[in-house]
Swiss-Prot record:
GO terms for cellular component: cytoplasm. This is Acetate kinase. InterPro entries: Ac/propionate_kinase, Aliphatic_acid_kin_short-chain, Aliphatic_acid_kinase_CS, ATPase_NBD. Pathway: Metabolic intermediate biosynthesis; acetyl-CoA biosynthesis; acetyl-CoA from acetate: step 1/2. Keywords: ATP-binding, Cytoplasm, Kinase, Magnesium, Metal-binding, Nucleotide-binding, Transferase. Its EC number is 2.7.2.1. The keyword Magnesium applies. It comes from Brachyspira hyodysenteriae (strain ATCC 49526 / WA1). PROSITE patterns: ACETATE_KINASE_1, ACETATE_KINASE_2. The gene is ackA. It catalyses: acetate + ATP = acetyl phosphate + ADP.
């Protein structure tokens, strides 16, 4: 059974075709700059070892999906004979609100519920809906599955997800913590439990990339997470501010005569590591720049300090901790950042072995010998997780 996984952005489509249930990747690709004068698509037929790059105008998501399907069935770089060989499509949907606590088969009712969340996810949900609509038009009767970034966090208790603001805001607008990166947090937590042979372990998962979040998982359930109503809350991120005094935006808006939309854009796209350093939102660039640039060093220190604080807070929330897992682009690839975050936590039982840490890749532990709290790097695979959920619902 072949499952196509789609991740639709506002101007991009990322895709992978899996042979299930073994989760073997047959083909993958990325289409960018949809709607611009020249769009770019990079397609790889994995087993054939063949790659094709296309640059042409792609007007919208439907045209993009048509182009992707033509490559999947192409004589040279295709991996299937025709579209009938696709049994199901799994869609990443960023925000499911309170409507979805697990992955679902997409129905007309489900689409309405996803549309209802566009208010609180204006950057992401409309794009996801465009991908769903394009696939439904082209593939007609093929089963579609929605996998939500928020659903894993629906187990968070009310005292952790409610904000201390007038309750009517929740009643009217469902203002609360939702959390994101749920598919990644759930996947790497499951991998940790497998490799340590500790089912239902208590784990802190640090998904650190351009977007970053920390989740406390107790007995297999998310009990708290750093992102909030939107992905803007929590850690210092590539271009997002993370936690701050809510009075700051209104103060600066008055001083600079900024609209709410302008301030939202600054906090989401011009803050975080980029805003503090003035250099880059990319941690690799900052690690290099920090050798001579104090602002780059400050940005790194703020990033690591914020993660460290969340680890301490979530240790308190969990009561007992079995392990800490690092994943995401930074979490998986920067031993330096992992080391900085875990520095000085020995008294809490968190003991990082510097030598093991420097070599940790893919799936590897790096705590000191005999330490009770396990430290792991585990590569995330959200596409595989989406494919598994899609297969289980559609088979």
């Amino acid at each position: 059974m072949n499952v196509l996984v789609i991740n639709s952005g506002s101007s991009s489509i990322k895709y992978q075709l899996f042979a299930m249930p073994e989760a073997k990747v047959l083909a993958k690709g990325l289409l960018e700059k949809i709607g611009e004068e020249i769009s770019a698509l990079k397609h790889t037929a994995v087993e054939k070892g063949k790659e094709k790059k296309i640059e042409q105008k792609v007007a919208d998501h439907k045209a993009g999906m048509s182009l992707i399907f033509s490559l999947l069935t192409d004589k040279e770089v295709g991996v299937i004979a025709d579209m009938n060989e696709i049994s199901a499509v799994g869609h990443r949907v960023v925000h499911g609100g309170e409507a979805f606590n697990k992955s679902i088969l997409i129905t007309d009712e489900a689409i309405k519920a996803i549309e209802a969340c566009c208010d609180i996810a204006p950057l992401h949900n409309p794009a996801g809906l465009q991908g769903i609509s394009a696939c439904k038009e082209i593939l007609k009767d093929v089963k579609m599955v929605g996998v939500f970034d928020t659903s894993f966090h629906q187990t968070i208790p009310d005292y952790a997800y409610m904000y201390a603001v007038p309750h009517e805001w929740y009643d009217k607008y469902k203002i609360r913590r939702y959390g994101f990166h749920g598919t990644s947090h759930k996947y790497v937590y499951g991998e940790f439990c497998k490799v340590t042979n500790k089912p239902n372990a208590n784990v802190i998962v640090c998904h650190l990339g351009n977007g970053a979040s920390v989740t406390a998982v107790k007995n297999g359930e998310s009990i708290d997470t750093s992102m909030g109503l939107t992905p803007l809350e929590g850690l210092v991120m590539g271009t997002r501010s993370g936690d701050m005094d809510p009075a700051v935006p209104t103060f600066v808006m008055a001083k600079e005569n900024l609209s709410a939309k302008e301030m939202d854009n600054i906090l989401n796209k011009k803050s975080g590591l980029l805003g503090v350093s003035g250099v880059s939102n990319d941690m690799r660039n900052l690690e290099e720049a920090a050798k001579t640039n104090p602002k780059a060093e400050l940005a790194i220190t703020m990033f690591c300090y914020r993660v460290k604080k969340y680890i301490g807070a979530y240790m308190a929330a969990l009561g007992h901790l079995d392990g800490i897992v690092f994943t995401g682009g930074i979490g998986e690839n920067s031993a330096y950042i992992r080391g900085r975050i875990l520095e000085g936590l020995d008294e809490l039982g968190i003991k990082c072995d510097a030598d093991k840490n420097s070599k940790a890749r893919g799936c590897a532990n790096f705590e000191k010998d005999g330490a009770a709290i396990k430290l792991y790097v585990i590569a995330t695979d959200e596409e595989k997780a989406i494919a598994m959920d899609t297969y289980n619902l559609a088979k």
